[in-house]
């Protein structure tokens, strides 16, 4: 299945789970914010109802992954390649000032296009070579500039995510990205904008009905 969240104004967030095969919404909940406190009891209630996924593709929000691991310890968490690529390239900026940053950005630009085990192995090999060449350089970079901090931050991001990047290559039913659910949220928000001014209670009712009726046509 696929997990994603989207905010509505400042007073609420929609948490959503989608079936990766038929792209229908499995369950959703409107909460104050995307957090362990709100997600954990929701996940537990779904588990009690019989939901036990083998794989969950997620955007990488740490508090949500912690809740998922506690509720479904057997589930593999596939990191969304698009989110990883976008986040890393945003931190590296369009024109990195260091050679290490430029090479890492070039490597990251290939991530979401990996379709085969061979391409995966090439990516991992190239990243291992990059780490070997630049790890000490990054370790001793002055941490007085945001750009230097963000270069190290990107390296840590990839290091932490790497074990969970490529489950989709072993099982074609596992999505590599959360794009399908993000597309659902985009359509929801586009429709919602035609109903601006709803109270929070009516907004939740609107979202509930939208998810219900959209499931009839997806």
PLM regions: where:
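A short hydrophobic/aromatic micro-motif that marks alpha-helical segments and, especially, helix-coil
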Residues: 19, 34, 98, 195-197
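Conserved phosphate-handling catalytic cores of large alpha/beta enzymes
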Residues: 94-96, 103
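Short helix/loop capping segments that flank catalytic or ligand/cofactor-binding pockets
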Residues: 11, 26, 66, 90, ...
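Inter-helix linker motif
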Residues: 72-94
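Acidic/histidine-rich catalytic cores and adjacent linkers
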Residues: 54, 58-65, 72, 102-218
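RNase H-like nuclease fold core
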Residues: 1-62, 66-74, 180
């Amino acid at each position: 299945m696929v997990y994603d969240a989207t905010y509505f104004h400042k007073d609420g967030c929609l948490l959503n789970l989608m079936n990766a095969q038929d792209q229908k919404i499995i369950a959703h909940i409107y909460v104050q914010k995307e957090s362990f406190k709100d997600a954990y009891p929701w996940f537990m209630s779904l588990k009690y109802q019989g939901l036990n996924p083998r794989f969950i593709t997620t955007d990488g929000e740490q508090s949500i992954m912690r809740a998922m691991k506690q509720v479904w310890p057997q589930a593999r968490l596939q990191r969304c390649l698009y989110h990883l690529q976008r986040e890393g390239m945003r931190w590296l900026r369009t024109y990195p000032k260091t050679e290490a940053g430029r090479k890492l950005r070039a490597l990251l630009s290939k991530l979401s296009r990996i379709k085969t085990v061979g391409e995966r192995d090439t990516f991992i090999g190239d990243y291992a070579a990059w780490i070997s060449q630049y790890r000490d350089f990054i370790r001793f970079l002055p941490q007085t500039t945001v750009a230097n901090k963000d270069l190290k931050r990107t390296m840590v991001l990839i290091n932490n995510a790497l074990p969970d990047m490529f489950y989709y290559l072993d099982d074609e039913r596992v999505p590599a990205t959360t794009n399908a659910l993000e597309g659902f949220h985009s359509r929801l928000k586009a429709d919602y904008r035609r109903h601006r001014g709803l109270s929070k209670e009516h907004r939740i009712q609107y979202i509930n009905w939208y998810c219900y009726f959209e499931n009839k046509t997806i």
